[in-house]
């Protein structure tokens, strides 16, 4: 039986005890030896009145044990009731086991938080494994718009979450600077260059980028080249103008991302795949051809819905169907150039060659149909050693008081990311972009996200952190020597009699703190940072509820002027809450204010 785990927290501890109970039964012959215990989970019960934790151990082992789940549960419960951590163990329904832990356990949880501070919840489950998270990767053809915003925030938060869970993360941006869209960018910039020289260019022709953001590119070209390019043939100026425009657009994009506290470690140019000393796309196609995964052939006409890249001709094809895709995929266009898919295969091969066997790509909703072919390609180029998880982020509907927001004049046909950040701040944007699962459409209301109410999640969570520090400031009437510095304050409060925290509301907060490390690990494993946002809102809600309770019931107030012991214990609880709120907000890239203005 296997029960090894890098997890070090209360839920992992209880899971290990369940494993040991099963191992003891196996030694006694009451369970077969060699059972896989990986399917056993220990989680919070759906109904808090049923206990502190629940396990499915009997349910998942019953078949292999050739026993009824309830009968097996009885045997497991007998072992668990003898455990020094467990107050009671009861069987529910068809064989679930509900566990209630002894009260001193919760004081120990708080001691862990006070010891680790904002580091509480950090995990080693990643074991230093290298992970490449690619996100944003917007075409370098203009400023970031609100549609890019969600993927940028999601990818950045996921990278932070994976780092917090012990992975060695590289954050990557793939610059799409080799497709036809950058030639359109160059022609659009050339028009602005002529405008900068004094020419009346009139209306921007259809097919070119109309936004005013290209005017500075035109002005820079005019300043650097005068009118020397005006009469030159396109073949002479296209590459020069394209490089200048891409460079200035990427500078703009980096600024947009910085405004939202988005960072990347690597900016990888698509053009570098073919413009360097070697044509890496050709090398990749050759590599796959040697494996028998590339051939010259003709695709049959598509059945039902048309395939967007279908052409009835002899062409170079990747044998995608051998790796789970629906059809084989073209690697070259009719003009002899590479398809975007061919470049994508080569790009992902470079990731694998750089040591990334674990890859995550964050894509927009319009790329959903592209997943199978890229995953098939990765299986082929890595001989099954590489994995790719594609996270699709759905659309963002930008509203103000429930009404759609008008488009940006500067950008031409969209609302820029910078405009949104300047209006509501990066914290509101980041938290709200994560307060819904990535594959669900998100309504982002500019009016709602600046409201100071429970209905505004980012305010409610940040206010929870600020409220904790307000309590600390007020507590100096009882403890004038309560330290300002975090580490010293945690040490000061760590000497409190934490067992005095026995009210159901206080114990509820302690249980919620105990859940944080498990939430971190589950969110990291599922690549779902929204779980952290949901957790923080729940924690803040319970904290605010306890504060409100104390306003109505004086004996539950955090500060009791004539009882220094209970005040110190409750301040320790407040310290635990603000530490975890700060930890989670940091993972999400959101500030944890000590006061709200």
UniProtKB/Swiss-Prot annotation:
It is an enzyme of class 6 (ligase). Keywords: Aminoacyl-tRNA synthetase, ATP-binding, Cytoplasm, Ligase, Nucleotide-binding, Protein biosynthesis. PANTHER family: ARGININE--TRNA LIGASE, CYTOPLASMIC (PTHR11956:SF5), ARGINYL-TRNA SYNTHETASE (PTHR11956). Pfam families: Arg_tRNA_synt_N, DALR_1, tRNA-synt_1d. It catalyses: tRNA(Arg) + L-arginine + ATP = L-arginyl-tRNA(Arg) + AMP + diphosphate. This is Arginine--tRNA ligase. One of its GO terms (biological process) is arginyl-tRNA aminoacylation. A motif ('HIGH' region) lies at residues 138-148. One of its GO terms (molecular function) is arginine-tRNA ligase activity. GO terms for cellular component: cytoplasm. It is found in: Cytoplasm.
């Amino acid at each position: 039986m296997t029960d090894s785990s890098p997890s070090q927290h209360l839920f992992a501890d209880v899971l290990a005890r369940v494993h040991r109970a099963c191992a003891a039964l196996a030694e006694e012959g009451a369970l077969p030896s060699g059972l896989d215990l990986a399917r056993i989970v220990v989680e919070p019960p759906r109904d808090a009145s049923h206990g502190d934790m629940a396990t499915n151990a009997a349910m998942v082992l019953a078949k292999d044990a050739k026993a009824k789940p309830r009968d097996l549960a009885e045997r497991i419960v007998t072992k668990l009731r003898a455990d020094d951590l467990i107050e009671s163990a009861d069987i529910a329904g068809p064989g679930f086991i509900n566990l209630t832990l002894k009260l001193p356990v919760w004081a120990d949880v708080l001691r862990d938080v006070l010891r680790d501070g904002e580091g509480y919840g950090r995990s080693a489950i990643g074991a230093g494994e290298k992970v490449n998270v690619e996100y944003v990767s917007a075409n370098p053809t203009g400023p970031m718009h609100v549609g890019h915003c969600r993927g940028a925030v999601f990818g950045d938060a996921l990278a932070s979450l994976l780092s917090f869970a012990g992975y060695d993360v590289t954050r990557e941006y793939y610059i799409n600077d080799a497709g036809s869209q950058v030639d359109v960018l160059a022609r659009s910039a050339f028009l602005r260059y002529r405008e900068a020289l004094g020419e009346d260019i009139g209306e921007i022709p259809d097919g070119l980028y109309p936004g005013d953001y290209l005017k500075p590119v035109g002005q820079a070209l005019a300043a650097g080249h005068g009118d020397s390019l005006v009469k030159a043939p396109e073949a002479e100026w296209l590459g020069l103008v394209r490089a200048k425009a891409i460079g200035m657009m990427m500078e703009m994009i980096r600024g947009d991302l910085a405004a939202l506290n988005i960072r990347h470690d690597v900016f990888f140019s698509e053009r570098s795949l073919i413009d360097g000393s070697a044509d890496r796309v050709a090398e990749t196609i050759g590599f796959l051809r040697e494996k028998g995964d590339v051939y010259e052939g003709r695709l049959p006409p598509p059945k039902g819905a048309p395939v967007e890249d279908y052409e009835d001709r002899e062409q170079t094809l990747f044998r995608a169907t051998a790796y789970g895709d629906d059809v084989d995929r073209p690697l070259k266009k009719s003009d002899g150039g590479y398809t975007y898919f061919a470049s994508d295969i080569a790009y992902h091969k470079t990731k694998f060659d750089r040591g990334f066997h674990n890859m995550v790509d964050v894509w927009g909703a319009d790329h959903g149909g592209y997943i199978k072919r890229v995953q098939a390609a990765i299986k082929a180029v890595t001989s099954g050693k590489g994995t790719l998880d594609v996270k699709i982020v759905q659309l963002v509907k930008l509203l103000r008081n429930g009404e759609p927001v008008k488009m940006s004049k500067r950008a031409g046909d969209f609302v820029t990311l910078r405009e949104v950040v300047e209006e509501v701040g990066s914290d509101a944007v980041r938290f709200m972009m994560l307060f819904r699962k990535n594959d669900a459409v998100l309504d982002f209301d500019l009016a709602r996200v600046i409201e100071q109410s429970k209905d505004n999640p980012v305010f409610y969570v940040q206010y929870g952190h600020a409220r904790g520090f307000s309590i600390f400031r007020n507590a100096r009437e009882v403890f004038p020597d309560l330290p300002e510095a975090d580490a010293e304050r945690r040490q000061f409060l760590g000497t409190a009699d934490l067992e005095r925290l026995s009210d159901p509301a206080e114990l509820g907060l302690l249980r919620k703190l105990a859940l944080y490390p498990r939430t971190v690990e589950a969110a990291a494993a599922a690549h779902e940072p929204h779980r952290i946002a949901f957790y923080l809102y729940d924690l803040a809600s319970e904290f605010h509820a306890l504060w409100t309770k104390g306003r109505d019931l004086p004996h539950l107030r955090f500060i009791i002027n004539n009882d220094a012991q209970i005040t110190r214990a409750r301040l320790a609880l407040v310290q635990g809450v603000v530490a975890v709120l700060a930890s989670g907000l940091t993972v999400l890239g959101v500030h944890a204010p000590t006061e709200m203005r």
